[in-house]
Curated annotation (Swiss-Prot):
SASP are degraded in the first minutes of spore germination and provide amino acids for both new protein synthesis and metabolism. The record marks E30, I31 as: Cleavage. SASP are bound to spore DNA. They are double-stranded DNA-binding proteins that cause DNA to change to an a-like conformation. They protect the DNA backbone from chemical and enzymatic cleavage and are thus involved in dormant spore's high resistance to UV light. One of its GO terms (molecular function) is double-stranded DNA binding. Belongs to the alpha/beta-type SASP family. Keywords: DNA-binding, Sporulation. The gene is sspC. InterPro entries: SASP_alpha/beta-type, SASP_alpha/beta-type_CS, SASP_DNA-binding, SASP_sf_alpha/beta. One of its GO terms (biological process) is DNA topological change. This is Small, acid-soluble spore protein C.
Amino acid sequence: MAQQSRSRSNNNNDLLIPQAASAIEQMKLEIASEFGVQLGAETTSRANGSVGGEITKRLVRLAQQNMGGQFH
């Protein structure tokens, strides 16, 4: 039981800032549209993953811009 509890606490899918949920969802929908991906259970992991990967790239780019590029 302790292992199961510890696994839940390490879930990386939880947003650190819950208020960002709608912005992340909007970004996901925009990227899916750009890529021509129809999100859903019937969509392949590769297609869904491409959207997630692009979200990550864009969030990293935004963070770097907000930091003034100090970590290049």
